[in-house]
Regions:
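C-terminal beta-signal and adjacent terminal beta-strands/loops
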Residues: 444, 502-503, 507, 603-606, ...
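Gram-negative outer-membrane beta-barrel transporters
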Residues: 378-384, 393, 491, 497-501, ...
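Flexible loop and strand-edge segments within Gram-negative outer membrane beta-barrel domains
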Residues: 194, 200-201, 206-208, 224-274, ...
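Signature of Gram-negative outer-membrane beta-barrel scaffolds
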Residues: 328-434, 457
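Periplasmic-side early beta-strands and strand-to-turn transitions of outer-membrane beta-barrels
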Residues: 102, 128, 140, 146-148, ...
Length: 680
C-alpha cells in the first residue's frame, strides 16, 4: 500500500511501482503482499525532517528511539530491531546494537530524508527473497538519482532551507546534477543543526549536527550495458548533559560516521539463460563513538566506547520471461554473499583509580551465503508466485583470550547453520477495479553478534552476562489475505494477517539469585519459544472532484489494529496500540493548497502490557496543518503547525519499560516549521 499520510498536490493510486516485495517491477495492485510506499513528494508535502517523522502517518509502522542517541529501529506490526531488514540502495544496513546502557548504541539505519527518492515497506516475513533479518518485514530506502533532478535536461538541482521549532533545527540542502553525453552525475549534501526536543519535560541542554553527502555516477555504455557508481557519507554528532545515580557533571558526545560505496551493473543480455542480469558489489563501514565524562567524589571518569561494523556485500539477480502455452512465467533467480567484521572496544579512564578496557562483544566476523528462485506464473486473471531461498551463515568470535568479562574463552564458540524458506503468493483479478490477494511466507533470522557473544561481568553487583553460541535461528510463518479496489477517483485496501514465530531470542536470567560474589545472576540470550501476532489494516483514498462544486478536495484514511501474544498467552509489549490517521486536502488551481491531518492513537492499558510495573499510556489525538504556495514555477514555500492542540502524549515504543512517569520522554508540544525550496 502506498503512503498513508494526508498529502496534497498529488492523488496517488495503486499504480505505484514497487520492487522490494517481489524483486520485480510490479504495481502495488498486482502484488501479493501488503506494501507501503513513501515517495519524495510525500516527504516534501508532510515537511518530514527526520526518520522520527517519516512513518508518523503510517498506521502499523513506528520507530523506537532513546533519549541520547535518537532513532534506533523501525517497528512493523510489533516486530522491530534486527528482525526488520533495512536496505539503502539495495545494501543491507548494519545491525542494531544495544549495549544495555546509554554509553554506546548503534541504530539500525542512518539516512537523511532529504536525499530519499522512495521508501518501500514490506509488511510480514520476506526471507524467501531477502534472507535473514526479514523475519518481520523489510524497509528499503532508495536515494535520489541524477535523473530526478535533470528531468530531461543536461543540468538541474535544488536549494532548500528548513526550520523546525520542535528542536530548533535549521537544515540546508543543495543538489547539483549534470548530463554529459551518456554520463549522468549527482552531488547532493544536507546539513542539519539542532537542539533538544521542546516537549513537556525539562530536558537538559543538547546540540545535534548531521551531515549527509551523496555522490552518484551513472553511465549508459550502450543499449545492453549500464554501470552505476555511488557513494554515501554520513556524519552525525550529538552533545548533551546526562544524569547517572551517584555521579555529577555528566556530559556525553556521540559521533556516528558511515561510508557506503558501491558499483552496480545492469546487463540486458537477452540469452536463453536470462533476459537481464543485475549485480552489485558494495562496501559499508559504520563507526559509533560514545564518550561519557562524569565525576564521582574525587574520581574524574571518561568512558570512550567504540563500536564498528564493516564489510562487503554482493548480490546478483537474473530475470527471464517465458511464454509456455496459456501460461506466462517471469523467473527471478540469483545469489548473494556478505562478509563483515564487528569490533567493540570500551576504554575507561579514571583519575583516582585504575584504567580499564573491556568489550561487550569480541572482534567477531560473519559470512552469509544465499541462493533464491521465484516464478511468477500468470494464467488469465490469476497470478501465482512460488519462491524458495537457501541461506547459510557462519560466525566466528575471533580471539577472546583477553576477555575481561569474567567468562572463560571457551564460552565463545563458532556458530554456523543454514535454512530453507519459501513463499507462495497469489493475486486474482476479479475485474479491472477489484483484486483479491493472499500469501503464505516463511521467515528466519540467524542469531546476531550481540545475541551470540554479548558478555559483561559484574559479580560485585550480583550479575554476569554470558555468551550463548548454542542459540537456534528464529523462524516464522505468516498468512495474509486482502482485497483491493482502484479506479480513477478512489483506491481502497483491506488486509488481515496472522503470523507465528518460533525460537524467539530474548535476554533472560537463567540461574542465580543476584547475590553479589557468592551467587550472582547469570543472564544470557536464549530461545524463549513462540509468539503470535495478528491484526487487520484498512486504507482509502478518495478524490472529491465528482461530488463537490469546487475541484481540488481529497481525503485519505488509514487504520491498523494489531494483537500479539507470547507462548504463555501474555501480551507482547512491542505491539503498538491501534492507530487511525485521517487527512483532508485542498489544492487550489492558484498554486496553493492545505492539508489537515488527524492522528488518533488508542491507549495502552494494563491488560495489554506484560509487566504490572510498566505504566500504561492514555489515548492521544494529534492535529497537524500544513500549507504550500508556489509564487513562481520553481519556488515552493511551505509552512506547518504541528500538534495544534498542544496534546501531551507518548510514543509507546519509547516508554514501554517505564515504571514511573517521566515527562522528558513525551513527544513535542505545539510546534511549527517553514520550508523554502528552489528547483533549477
Amino acid at each position: 500500500l502506498h503512503y498513508q499520510g494526508a498529502y496534497a498536490e498529488d492523488h496517488s493510486t495503486f499504480n505505484e511501482v514497487v520492487v522490494t516485495a517481489t524483486r520485480t517491477n510490479s504495481q502495488i495492485e498486482d502484488t501479493a503482499a501488503s506494501v507501503a510506499v513513501v515517495t519524495d513528494k510525500n516527504i516534501e508535502e508532510s515537511m518530514v525532517t527526520g526518520l522520527d517523522d517519516l512513518f508518523e502517518y503510517m498506521p502499523g509502522v513506528t520507530v523506537k528511539t532513546n533519549s541520547r542517541q535518537g532513532v534506533q529501529s523501525i517497528n512493523i506490526r510489533g516486530i522491530e530491531g534486527n528482525r526488520i531488514k533495512v536496505l539503502v540502495d539495495g545494501v543491507s544496513q548494519g545491525n542494531q546494537f544495544e549495549s544495555g546502557n546509554t554509553f554506546i548504541n548503534s541504530a539500525r539505519v542512518n539516512v537523511d530524508t532529504d536525499l530519499i527518492k522512495a521508501v518501500e515497506i514490506v509488511k510480514g516475513a520476506a526471507s524467501s527473497l531477502h534472507g535473514s533479518d526479514a523475519i518481520g518485514g523489510i524497509v528499503a530506502f532508495e536515494t535520489k538519482d541524477p535523473a530526478d533532478f535533470l528531468k530531461g535536461r543536461n543540468f538541474g538541482g535544488h536549494a532548500k532551507f528548513n526550520y523546525s521549532s520542535e528542536d530548533n533545527t535549521f537544515s540546508e540542502s543543495v543538489a547539483l546534477a549534470n548530463k554529459t553525453g551518456d554520463l549522468e552525475s549527482l552531488v547532493a549534501y544536507t546539513r542539519r543543526d539542532g537542539n533538544e526536543l521542546d516537549n513537556f519535560g525539562d530536558l537538559a541542554d543538547a546540540s545535534t549536527e548531521a551531515n549527509n553527502l551523496l555522490v552518484k555516477l551513472q553511465y549508459q555504455v550502450n543499449d545492453a550495458h549500464r554501470v552505476e557508481f555511488n557513494g554515501n557519507y554520513i556524519r552525525n554528532k550529538g552533545n548533551g548533559k546526562q544524569s547517572y545515580n551517584g555521579y555529577t557533571n555528566a556530559t556525553s558526545e556521540d559521533v556516528t560516521e558511515q561510508y557506503q560505496v558501491g558499483i552496480k551493473h545492469i546487463w540486458e543480455m537477452q540469452t536463453a539463460l536470462a533476459d537481464s542480469l543485475t549485480w552489485q558489489l558494495d562496501w559499508l563501514s559504520k563507526e559509533e563513538n560514545g564518550i561519557t565524562d562524569r565525576v564521582k567524589g574525587q574520581n574524574i571518569q571518561r568512558k570512550d566506547y567504540i563500536y564498528e561494523d564493516e564489510g562487503y556485500q554482493f548480490d546478483s539477480q537474473f530475470d527471464k520471461y517465458l511464454s509456455l502455452g496459456s501460461t506466462e512465467h517471469y523467473f527471478v533467480y540469483g545469489a548473494s554473499f556478505s562478509d563483515k567484521d564487528i569490533k567493540n572496544v570500551n576504554k575507561e579512564y579514571n583519575s583516582a583509580s585504575a584504567n580499564k578496557e573491556i568489550f561487550y562483544i569480541p572482534s567477531a566476523s560473519e559470512r552469509r551465503y544465499g541462493l533464491f528462485l521465484q516464478d511468477e506464473i500468470t494464467v488469465g486473471n490469476f497470478t501465482i508466485t512460488p519462491g524458495v531461498r537457501w541461506d547459510a551463515f557462519e560466525t566466528d568470535p575471533g580471539d577472546t583470550s583477553s576477555n575481561p568479562s569474567g567468562n572463560a574463552a571457551s564460552d565463545y564458540k563458532k556458530f554456523s547453520d543454514s535454512a530453507f524458506t519459501g513463499r507462495l503468493g497469489s493475486v486474482y483479478k476479479l475485474n479491472e477495479q477489484h483484486r483479491l490477494f493472499a500469501q503464505i511466507s516463511q521467515g528466519f533470522r540467524a542469531p546476531d553478534f550481540q545475541e551470540l557473544y554479548y558478555s559483561f561481568g559484574n559479580p560485585m553487583h550480583g550479575y554476569i552476562f554470558k555468551p550463548n553460541p548454542d542459540l537456534k535461528a528464529e523462524d516464522s510463518i505468516s498468512y495474509e489475505f486482502g482485497w483491493r479496489h482502484n479506479n480513477d477517483i478512489s483506491s481502497s485496501e483491506v488486509s488481515v494477517f496472522y503470523s507465528d514465530y518460533d525460537n524467539f531470542i530474548e535476554s533472560k536470567t537463567v540461574s542465580g539469585t543476584w547475590t553479589p560474589v557468592t551467587d550472582p545472576a547469570i543472564q544470557q540470550y536464549v530461545n524463549i519459544g513462540k509468539a503470535t501476532i495478528k491484526g487487520i489494516e484498512f486504507s482509502n483514498q478518495l478524490s472529491w472532484n465528482k461530488f463537490m462544486p469546487i475541484e481540488g478536495f481529497s481525503s485519505r484514511v488509514a487504520a491498523a489494529y494489531t494483537e500479539g501474544e507470547d507462548g504463555n498467552n501474555n501480551p507482547l509489549n512491542s505491539v503498538n496500540p491501534w492507530n487511525l490517521v485521517a487527512g483532508f486536502n485542498y489544492d487550489s488551481e492558484q498554486n496553493w493548497g492545505t492539508t489537515l491531518t488527524i492522528n488518533y492513537t488508542a491507549s495502552k492499558d494494563k491488560s495489554d502490557i506484560n509487566d504490572d510495573k510498566v505504566l500504561p499510556i492514555s489515548a492521544a489525538t494529534v492535529v497537524d496543518i500544513t500549507a504550500y504556495y508556489k509564487p513562481i514555477k520553481d519556488l515552493t514555500l511551505r509552512a506547518g503547525l504541528f500538534n495544534v492542540t498542544d496534546e501531551e502524549y507518548y510514543n509507546w515504543n519509547d516508554v514501554r519499560d517505564l515504571q514511573t512517569e517521566n515527562k522528558d520522554l513525551t513527544q513535542a508540544g505545539r510546534n511549527w516549521s517553514i520550508t523554502a525550496k528552489y528547483e533549477f
